[in-house]
């Protein structure tokens, strides 16, 4: 899980999701692409 000020989709499987007011990237193909805005 990377914590970044600016999060971007890294591949076509990445999805932007808002959970509890926090923007996240989840990726089914590559778990290393997981990110959180913070």
From Swiss-Prot:
Name assigned to this protein: Large ribosomal subunit protein bL36
Protein family membership: Belongs to the bacterial ribosomal protein bL36 family.
GO biological process, one term: translation
GO molecular function: structural constituent of ribosome
Cysteines engaged in disulfide bonds, as pairs: none
Keywords: Ribonucleoprotein, Ribosomal protein
CC terms in the record's Gene Ontology section: cytoplasm; ribonucleoprotein complex; ribosome
Xref: InterPro entries: Ribosomal_bL36, Ribosomal_bL36_sp
Entry-linked HAMAP family: Ribosomal_bL36 (MF_00251)
Pfam families on file: Ribosomal_L36 (PF00444)
